[in-house]
Amino acid sequence: MAFRMSEQPRTIKIYNLLAGTNEFIGEGDAYIPPHTGLPANSTDIAPPDIPAGFVAVFNSDESSWHLVEDHRGKTVYDVASGNALFISELGPLPENVTWLSPEGEFQKWNGTAWVKDTEAEKLFRIREAEETKNNLMQVASEHIAPLQDAADLEIATEEEISLLEAWKKYRVLLNRVDTSTAQDIEWPALP
């Protein structure tokens, strides 16, 4: 039944709505003075029974209630990336998510569970080894440059010549490191 204004003051039961979402947040009695309408964000139409995991949302255009899934405050996981998604809005869950969290790094979703993604881990370890190798090559080159300058100018001390030889040997051994065997690499010792 739709609300009708009256010439008489009255107290009626109203159902309060959350501004913005129009979801049911409680009921109470409201005093309605003559020739006035309902308080803002309320209706006099009772909501349906609300099962767990849902909220009742009032559609003021249709003057009716709808049950909408409510997963707010919960965390789900994107099956493509494994990233956690915090649900903050009403409605059904996004597609391609699961309630199951991945256990550790390098996990992929197989349709029913998270499984170890050995290929992704291997590629990560190779990239990590390449980065380490590049950084160590840069360190070696930075040590070699001034020692090589001293040798080229024939002003290097015996200690500098020995260090130059050690750093060059280190750089050659480092260059021979095969990063495709990332987990089995034996890095040469720094001079």
Swiss-Prot record:
Belongs to the tfa family. It comes from the Bacteria. Disulfide bonds: none annotated. Pfam families: Caudo_TAP. It comes from Escherichia coli (strain K12). The gene is tfaR. This is Prophage tail fiber assembly protein homolog TfaR. The lineage of its organism: Bacteria, Pseudomonadati, Pseudomonadota, Gammaproteobacteria, Enterobacterales.
